[in-house]
UniProtKB/Swiss-Prot annotation:
The chain crosses the membrane at residues 26-46, 65-85, 144-164, 166-186, 250-270, 276-296. This is ATP-dependent lipid A-core flippase. Keywords: ATP-binding, Cell inner membrane, Cell membrane, Lipid transport, Membrane, Nucleotide-binding, Translocase, Transmembrane, Transmembrane helix, Transport. Involved in lipopolysaccharide (LPS) biosynthesis. Translocates lipid A-core from the inner to the outer leaflet of the inner membrane. Transmembrane domains (TMD) form a pore in the inner membrane and the ATP-binding domain (NBD) is responsible for energy generation. Residues 29-311 form the ABC transmembrane type-1 domain. One of its GO terms (cellular component) is plasma membrane. PANTHER family: ATP-BINDING CASSETTE SUB-FAMILY B MEMBER 10, MITOCHONDRIAL, ATP-DEPENDENT PERMEASE MDL1, MITOCHONDRIAL. Belongs to the ABC transporter superfamily. Lipid exporter (TC 3.A.1.106) family. It comes from the Bacteria. Signal peptide: none annotated. It is an enzyme of class 7 (translocase). It comes from Nitrosococcus oceani (strain ATCC 19707 / BCRC 17464 / JCM 30415 / NCIMB 11848 / C-107). It is a multi-pass membrane protein.
C-alpha cells in the first residue's frame, strides 16, 4: 500500500493520528492547559531568583525574606498538581486511542478479502496490531507531553531572559539553527530506521508463530536447529536496526547539549565582563543563569523524544496503510431469506494472478436443489477454488454464479454466506467452550437445547458427556485438546446448527480412523439430508452415491455424470477410481494416496 505524498509527510500523519483524540478533546485540552501551567512554573522558578538574591541577600528586605519561601512552596504545589493532571490525563487519552485504533484495525481486518490474507504473513499483521499500536501510544503521550510542555518551557524561559537582557539572549538564540538542523537530520533517520524495525518485528513474530504452531512438526522432523537459526537471523536483524537508532540517539543528544553549553559559556563569558557587570544586578545575573540552566533539560528531552516521535509516526503510517486497504466488495442490495439450493455456474473463469493464467476456465455447471455434487480431480485442478467463488471469498474474473436464479453479486455478503455451511478436514476451532464453538456466530441467540440437539445429531454428545465440564469444556487453541474425529463432529454440529441450505464438504472425513469415520459418516448423512451439497475429494463411498460427479482437470470440466456412467466411459475418472481401488486393497486411505477424489 502506497500513500499519497501529502499523507506520507510526518506532519500529515501525526495530524491524522491526533484526530483520534477528538472524542476525548476535553480531557486532552485540560492536559494541555496543565502543561502550560507546569511550563510557567519553570519560568516562575527562574524569576524568583531575582528577588531572592536582590531582596533577601543584597537589600535584606524583611517582606521579601518572608514571602519568597511561601512563593516557592506554592510554586511547587501548583507544579505537582499540574504534572499529575497532565500525566494521568494524557495516559488516559492515549490508552483510549490505542483501544480505538486496535478495534478499528481488527474490524477492518475482518472485512478484508481472502486475497489480502493470501499475500500477507499473519505474524506481520499481528505485529501491526500489537507492536505498531504501542509505538503510537508512546507518540501520543510521551511525545506530546515533551513537545508541548518543554516547548512552552523554552519559550517562557527565553521570554524571561529577553526581558532581563536582550543581548545575552541573542547569543543563546544563535545556537538555535544548529540545533534545529541536527534535530531535522535525526528525525529523518529515526523514521527510516523505525520502518525497518517494524518490519523486523513482524518477521520475529512470524517465525515465532510458525514455530509455536508447528511445534510437533518441528520436533518430529528435527527442525529445532533450523528454526533456531531462522529465529536468530530475524532477531539479529531486529537488534541491528534497534542499535542503529540507539547510536543515532546517543550521538545526537550530546551534540545538541554541547552546542547549548557553548551558548551558555559565551553568555557567562560576556556577562562576567566588567562592562556588563556594571549594567546588571546580582539577582538579574543569577536569574538569567538559572533560566539558562533550566533550558538544558527541555532541550535534552526534546532531542531525546525525537526517536519516540518518529517511531510513532512510522508506526502510524503502517497502521493507516492497513486501514487504507480496500475491504471485500459488498455492492449487493438484495436479500434472500432461505435459498432452495439451486446453483448455476455460467461461463465461469478465474485467475489468482493474470500472469499465471486461469485456475478455472469456462465452467458451466447446474446443480438442482438437494443434489449432492462431487468435485474430483488431481490437486490443483480447481476444486477448492470453485467453492471459494461460490462463497465470494474471491471475485470471478468472468462469468457469473447464480443461487435460485439470483446473481450472487446482487446479494449482500451476509445474506449470501448465511445460505452456506462449511465442513473441512482442517477444522478451525477457537480457544473457547464446546458450546461456543458449536453455536459460533449465533451463541447469544441460541438455546442450550438447540446446541445439544445439534451435538446429538453430529454424534458428538457421546464424547462431550464424558468430559468433566461437558459443553462448558474449553478445548484449547484450535481444539488441540480434542482428537481429529471429535473436532470433525463439532464442525458438523456447527453446520447442523446453522441449518444452511447449501453445504460444502471439503475432505471432511480424510485421515480418520475407522471408528471416527463411522461416527462422521453417520453425522454427515444427517447433515446432507435436504441440502444441496458440494463434496470435494470425499471418501469413495460418498463419491459413488453422489447425484453427479464433476471431474476437473487443469481448471476445466472434462467429465461429468454418475459414478456408474463415468466408469463405463473408461476415461479419466475410471483411471482415478482404479488407482484408489488398488490403494484401498493395499490398506492405504484413498485420500492419503493424494489422487484428488
Amino acid at each position: 500500500m502506497t500513500f499519497t505524498p501529502s499523507l506520507n509527510s510526518g506532519l500529515a500523519v501525526y495530524r491524522r493520528l491526533l484526530s483520534y483524540t477528538r472524542p476525548y478533546r476535553w480531557i486532552f485540552a485540560a492536559s494541555i492547559i496543565t502543561m502550560a501551567i507546569y511550563a510557567a512554573t519553570e519560568t516562575g522558578l527562574a524569576a524568583l531568583m531575582k528577588p531572592l538574591m536582590d531582596g533577601s541577600f543584597i537589600e535584606r528586605d524583611p517582606a521579601t525574606i518572608q514571602i519568597i519561601p511561601l512563593l516557592l512552596i506554592g510554586l511547587f504545589v501548583i507544579r505537582g498538581g499540574a504534572n499529575f493532571i497532565t500525566q494521568y490525563g494524557l495516559k488516559w487519552v492515549a490508552r483510549r486511542v490505542v483501544r480505538d485504533l486496535r478495534e478499528q484495525m481488527f474490524c477492518h481486518l475482518l472485512a478484508l478479502p481472502a486475497r489480502y490474507y493470501d499475500q500477507k504473513a499473519s505474524g506481520q499483521l499481528l505485529a501491526k496490531l500489537i507492536y505498531d499500536v504501542e509505538q503510537v501510544s508512546n507518540a501520543a503521550t510521551d511525545a506530546i507531553l515533551t513537545i508541548i510542555r518543554d516547548s512552552l518551557t523554552i519559550l517562557g524561559l527565553l521570554a524571561w531572559m529577553a526581558y532581563l537582557n536582550g543581548l545575552l539572549t541573542l547569543i543563546i538564540l544563535v545556537t538555535a539553527p544548529l540545533i534545529a538542523l541536527i534535530i531535522w537530520w535525526v528525525s529523518h533517520r529515526f523514521r527510516r530506521i523505525s520502518r525497518k524495525i517494524q518490519n523486523s518485528m513482524g518477521d520475529v513474530s512470524q517465525v515465532a508463530q510458525e514455530t509455536i504452531e508447528g511445534h510437533r512438526e518441528v520436533k518430529i522432523f528435527g527442525g529445532q536447529t533450523y528454526e533456531a537459526e531462522r529465529f536468530d537471523q530475524v532477531n539479529e536483524q531486529n537488534r541491528r536496526q534497534t542499535m542503529k537508532m540507539a547510536a543515532t540517539d546517543a550521538i545526537s543528544q550530546p551534540v545538541v547539549q554541547l552546542i547549548a553549553v557553548l551558548g551558555l559559556a559565551g553568555v557567562i563569558h560576556l556577562a562576567t565582563r566588567e562592562s556588563m557587570l556594571a549594567q546588571i544586578s546580582v539577582g538579574t545575573f543569577i536569574s538569567f543563569i538559572t533560566a539558562m540552566m533550566l533550558l538544558l533539560g527541555p532541550v535534552k528531552r526534546l532531542t531525546k523524544i525525537n526517536g519516540t516521535l518518529q517511531r510513532g509516526i512510522a508506526a502510524a503510517q503502517s497502521i493507516f496503510g492497513l486501514l487504507a486497504e480496500t475491504p471485500e466488495a459488498d455492492r449487493g442490495q438484495q436479500s434472500l431469506r432461505r435459498a432452495r439450493g439451486a446453483i448455476r455456474f455460467e461461463h465461469l473463469s478465474f485467475c489468482y494472478e493474470p500472469a499465471k493464467g486461469p485456475v478455472l476456465e469456462n465452467i458451466d455447471l447446474e446443480i438442482k436443489p438437494y443434489q449432492t455434487i462431487a468435485l474430483v480431480g488431481h490437486s490443483g485442478s480447481g476444486k477448492s477454488t470453485l467453492v471459494s467463488l461460490l462463497a465470494r471469498f474471491y471475485e470471478t474474473t468472468s462469468g457469473r454464479i447464480l443461487i435460485d436464479e439470483m446473481d450472487i453479486q446482487t446479494l449482500r455478503l451476509t445474506e449470501l454466506r448465511r445460505q452456506i455451511a462449511l465442513v473441512s478436514q482442517q477444522i478451525i476451532l477457537f480457544n473457547d467452550t464446546i458450546a461456543h464453538n458449536i453455536a459460533y456466530g449465533s451463541y447469544q441467540q441460541t438455546s442450550k437445547q438447540d446446541i445439544i440437539r445439534a451435538a446429538e445429531a453430529a454424534h458428538a454428545m457421546e464424547f462431550i458427556n464424558r468430559l468433566p465440564d461437558g459443553l462448558d469444556t474449553v478445548i484449547g487453541e484450535k481444539g488441540v485438546l480434542l482428537s481429529g474425529g471429535q473436532r470433525q463432529r463439532l464442525a458438523i454440529a456447527r453446520a447442523l446448527l446453522k441449518d444452511a441450505p447449501i453445504l460444502i464438504l471439503d475432505e471432511a472425513t480424510a485421515s480418520l480412523d475407522t471408528e471416527a469415520e463411522r461416527h462422521i459418516q453417520a453425522a454427515l448423512e444427517t447433515l446432507m439430508r435436504q441440502r444441496t451439497t458440494l463434496v470435494i475429494a470425499h471418501r469413495l463411498s460418498t463419491v459413488e452415491n453422489a447425484d453427479q460427479i464433476i471431474v476437473l482437470h487443469q481448471g476445466q470440466i472434462i467429465e461429468r455424470g454418475t459414478h456408474s456412467q463415468l466408469l463405463a466411459r473408461e476415461s479419466h475418472y475410471a483411471g482415478l477410481y482404479r488407482l484408489q481401488f488398488r490403494h484401498s486393497h493395499e490398506h492405504v486411505s484413498p485420500l492419503s494416496a493424494n489422487v484428488g477424489l
